[in-house]
Amino acid sequence: MATLKEKLIASVADDEAAVPNNKITVVGVGQVGMACAISILGKSLADELALVDVLEDKLKGEMMDLQHGSLFLQTPKIVADKDYSVTANSKIVVVTAGVRQQEGESRLNLVQRNVNVFKFIIPQIVKYSPDCTIIVVSNPVDILTYVTWKLSGLPKHRVIGSGCNLDSARFRYLMAEKLGIHPSSCHGWILGEHGDSSVAVWSGVNVAGVSLQELNPEMGTDNDSENWKEVHKMVVDSAYEVIKLKGYTNWAIGLSVADLIESMLKNLSRIHPVSTMVKGMYGIENEVFLSLPCILNARGLTSVINQKLKDDEVAQLRKSADTLWDIQKDLKDL
């Protein structure tokens, strides 16, 4: 007796499952992981989305909740499992998993605890998707991107840290607000470490090709009567401010990660400030990852732009590198 489905649908091709073309995996379904997931779905970047976490009930609940929105999405397959086999054949894997910093905990201790988590996660990712590009989002992102590169054995053009893509977006938003224009028309770069020691490249800030530092030579210095330096301070403080108000940050980083993925999956060769291996650049001698303007396309992170930095900006970058290396050099089991 033919089933309803057989009566309704006449098969033309064999019913074998197609290998996905643009599969994306998100590891960790906390606030940041799910913001990444919804941003990826909202931009229709994936033909399959896989979620992985150790919390099985939470994981299944998030998967079902997204699946129930399938009518409003163009992503035909959404899957989840604590077993990494569900991630097989991913083009891009976003890592948001990790332990939270405890009150009074040193950064080194937090990093070492996250290294121990990554030692389980990263080999599993590479086992099932050996050709993937990994985007690291977990903090401290620059150090954990280095850790991922070490543990994965992947070439450095396929291990990327979300880095200062969000810091630069915050910078452009805050500058644009002051000027009354859209952030996409206000150009400026935050480089270096994602976080407290990031570097604002004031010499490159421009609107419609007009250098703002030429209009106000004191811009970004302590002598500036308009106090533009405060904008960079607001960028650095903004995460702490949001965390104080709502407990965590998630929407902006989720949108930022989807922006990076779009440049890669659509082979756009757009330039983003993301974390990459900077040894040999700007006189940095250690294997550290910092954000520089990088070209992202279908091959991953293919090139770095040689930004013309002023002496004090280079000094700040090197200081960032030293700060990170001080922590990295003491990490165990890499």
Swiss-Prot record:
The modification N6-acetyllysine is found at residues 7, 58, 119, 329. The active site is at 194 (proton acceptor). One of its GO terms (molecular function) is kinase binding. Pfam families: Ldh_1_C, Ldh_1_N. It is a peripheral membrane protein. It catalyses: (S)-lactate + NAD(+) = pyruvate + NADH + H(+). The modification Phosphoserine is found at residues 11, 44. Its main location: cytoplasm. It is found in: Cytoplasm; Mitochondrion inner membrane. One of its GO terms (cellular component) is myelin sheath. It is an enzyme of class 1 (oxidoreductase). The modification N-acetylalanine is found at residue 2. One of its GO terms (biological process) is NAD metabolic process. Pathway: Fermentation; pyruvate fermentation to lactate; (S)-lactate from pyruvate: step 1/1. Substrate binds at residues 107, 139, 170, 249. Keywords: Acetylation, Cytoplasm, Membrane, Mitochondrion, Mitochondrion inner membrane, NAD, Oxidoreductase, Phosphoprotein. Homotetramer. Interacts with PTEN upstream reading frame protein MP31; the interaction leads to inhibition of mitochondrial lactate dehydrogenase activity, preventing conversion of lactate to pyruvate in mitochondria. Interconverts simultaneously and stereospecifically pyruvate and lactate with concomitant interconversion of NADH and NAD(+). PANTHER family: L-2-HYDROXYCARBOXYLATE DEHYDROGENASE (NAD(P)(+)) (PTHR43128), L-LACTATE DEHYDROGENASE B CHAIN (PTHR43128:SF2). This is L-lactate dehydrogenase B chain. It comes from Mus musculus (Mouse).
